[in-house]
Amino acid sequence: MVLSGSDKTNVKGIFSKIGGQAEDYGAEALERMFATFPQTKTYFPHFDVSPGSAQVKAHGKKVAAALVEAANHIDDIATALSKLSDLHAQKLRVDPVNFKLLGQCFLVVVAIHNPSALTPEVHASLDKFLCAVGNVLTAKYR
């Protein structure tokens, strides 16, 4: 997925609004994913997946860090997330559809907390960005 110049500007703009709340957004997105798509819990058998658990918050922090890293290196997401892609493809073997599900949950969280900032254009740009991140994370499955 190719991000245009305006997409990149929109993504960087929304991440600047998220700011120090990215970790909370990551945890909330995971909580939403677990509630909406309970089959995703199977990848976390050792986690307490209840809302607000320390393990969900810790993994939410990792999710947020990866998204921030991708946004900070938006011109080369593949290199920025290469190690994470290797981990998910070779060790964790997460079903690729789960990246799309988590991306949609993250988009919902951003919309809830930033309704005025998430214009249709920003929404489309963020969706394209999250799809690009998902594509990078699943590229090494092939």
From Swiss-Prot:
Q: Which residues bind heme b?
A: 88
What SUPFAM superfamilies does this protein's entry cite? Globin-like
One Pfam annotation reads Globin
Q: Which residues are recorded as binding O2?
A: 59
- InterPro entries cross-referenced by the UniProt entry: Globin, Globin-like_sf, Globin/Proto, Hemoglobin_a-typ, Hemoglobin_oxygen_transport, Hemoglobin_pi
Which GO terms fall under molecular function for this chain's record? Answer: haptoglobin binding; heme binding; iron ion binding; organic acid binding; oxygen binding; oxygen carrier activity; peroxidase activity
Q: Where is the Globin domain?
A: 2-142
**GO process terms (BP):** hydrogen peroxide catabolic process
What tissues has this protein been observed in? Red blood cells.
Q: Which CDD domains match?
A: Hb-alpha-like
Lineage: superkingdom: Eukaryota
What's a single GO CC term here? hemoglobin complex
On whether Cytoplasm is a keyword of this UniProt record, the answer is no
Matching entries from PANTHER family are given as:
HEMOGLOBIN FAMILY MEMBER, HEMOGLOBIN SUBUNIT ALPHA
State whether it acts alone or in a complex, and with which partners, per the record: Heterotetramer of two alpha chains and two beta chains.
Q: What family, per the record? A: Belongs to the globin family.
Q: What is the stated purpose of this protein?
A: Involved in oxygen transport from the lung to the various peripheral tissues.
**What protein name is recorded for this chain?**
Hemoglobin subunit alpha-A
- What is the species listed in this Swiss-Prot or TrEMBL entry? Ara ararauna (Blue-and-yellow macaw)
- Originating gene: HBAA
